[in-house]
Curated annotation (Swiss-Prot):
It is found in: Plastid, Chloroplast thylakoid membrane. Its cofactor is heme. Binds 1 heme group covalently. SUPFAM superfamilies: Cytochrome f subunit of the cytochrome b6f complex, transmembrane anchor, Cytochrome f, large domain, Rudiment single hybrid motif. GO terms for biological process: photosynthesis. Component of the cytochrome b6-f complex, which mediates electron transfer between photosystem II (PSII) and photosystem I (PSI), cyclic electron flow around PSI, and state transitions. InterPro entries: Cyt-f_TM (IPR024058), Cyt_f (IPR002325), Cyt_f_lg_dom (IPR024094), Cyt_f_lg_dom_sf (IPR036826), Rudment_hybrid_motif (IPR011054). Residues 1-35 form the signal peptide. It comes from the Eukaryota. This is Cytochrome f. The keyword Lipid metabolism does not apply. The lineage of its organism: Eukaryota, Viridiplantae, Streptophyta, Embryophyta, Tracheophyta.
Length: 320
């Protein structure tokens, strides 16, 4: 009987441990993952809105620069590089989900024209593979091969990301044409300020939800604060919860207004978007242009030779 009770107790402890571990994993995973472009896949069918705004800006509120470099023109069924640069000060440290400071990660979403897609590994040259490094790109949706996402990846190593792109061939793809196409890119450095569910992360400023007097500040054991604000007119108390990370900017006894910042803004990152244009060039048009240029050069040469010949004839007649 004692052995059976011991076994039942041990079984219960193991079950509770697994349940708690699973809950911690889910909460931690959600708080970390929702801050990068790759996770916009979860809530949006298309990352680019009708207004031209990329949805990553919903969570990354600070505006930062991003740059894209692509060839001016490419031939059909050709692999080329799309280089995305996400610049930032490498000395900066961001607030992590646990409130500690750490290095910034980066992420990007690349929106290509229909028909353009990620180049297969066997079409990528060794030189391009060296530039890509260990990056692993994903399509935004299985049906949207022209939209690629990457991240989060270490910013100190991958502030410049090289995408290997395969251009379409209108001869085999009836939806592709020899035209000029737009390319859009969005890139972020650091964590977001708002999660997709609308809740704030700990990487943003926290404001007072009520006006009044700061009557009590409790520093929590695992970081963060509980700030009690008392309305002087009716004595009503409101408690604002501050997670670990932001630095407190108010003190007990201080009079504050509604929406007044209670903390500093710890965010050092941000999101930016840019665009470029690329021409899918018809090889026959290129050949025609080369033929035209060659004919012009030959015509100039023959004109010079004819002029020289005419001058010689004139000189001989004068001497005669």
């Amino acid at each position: 009987m004692q052995i059976r009770n011991t076994f039942s107790s041990l079984k219960g402890e193991i079950t509770r441990f697994i349940s708690v571990s699973l809950m911690i994993y889910i909460i931690t995973r959600a708080s970390i993952s929702n801050a990068y472009p790759i996770f916009a896949q979860q809530g949006f069918e298309n990352p680019r809105e009708a207004t031209g705004r990329i949805v990553c800006a919903n969570c990354h509120l600070a505006n930062k620069p991003v740059d894209i470099e692509v060839p001016q023109a490419v031939l059909p069924d050709t692999v080329f590089e799309a280089v995305v640069r996400i610049p930032y000060d490498m000395q900066l440290k961001q607030v992590l989900a646990n409130g500690k400071k750490g290095a910034l990660n980066v992420g990007a979403v690349l929106i290509l024209p229909e028909g353009f897609e990620l180049a297969p590994p066997d079409r990528i040259s060794p030189e391009m593979k060296e530039k890509i490094g260990k990056l692993s790109f994903q399509t935004y949706r299985p049906t949207k091969k022209n939209i690629l996402v990457i991240g989060p990846v270490p910013g100190q190593k991958y502030s410049e990301i090289t995408f290997p792109i395969l251009s379409p061939n209108p001869a085999t793809n009836k939806d592709a044409y020899f035209l000029k196409y737009p390319i859009y890119v969005g890139g972020n450095r650091g964590r977001g300020q708002i999660y997709p569910d609308g809740n704030k992360s700990n990487n943003t400023v926290y404001n007072a939800t009520s006006a009044g007097i700061v009557s009590k500040i409790i520093r929590k054991e695992k970081g963060g604060y509980e700030i009690t604000i008392t309305d002087a007119s009716n004595g009503r108390e409101v408690v604002d919860i501050i997670p670990p990370g932001p630095e407190l900017r108010v003190s007990e006894g201080q009079s504050i207004k509604l929406d007044q910042p209670l903390t500093s803004n710890p965010n050092v990152g941000g999101f930016g978007q840019a665009d470029a244009e690329i021409v899918l060039q018809d090889p026959l048009r290129v050949q025609g242009l080369l033929f035209f240029l060659a004919s012009v050069v030959l015509a100039q040469i023959f004109l010079v030779l004819k002029k020289k010949q005419f001058e010689k004839v004139q000189l001989s007649e004068m001497n005669f």
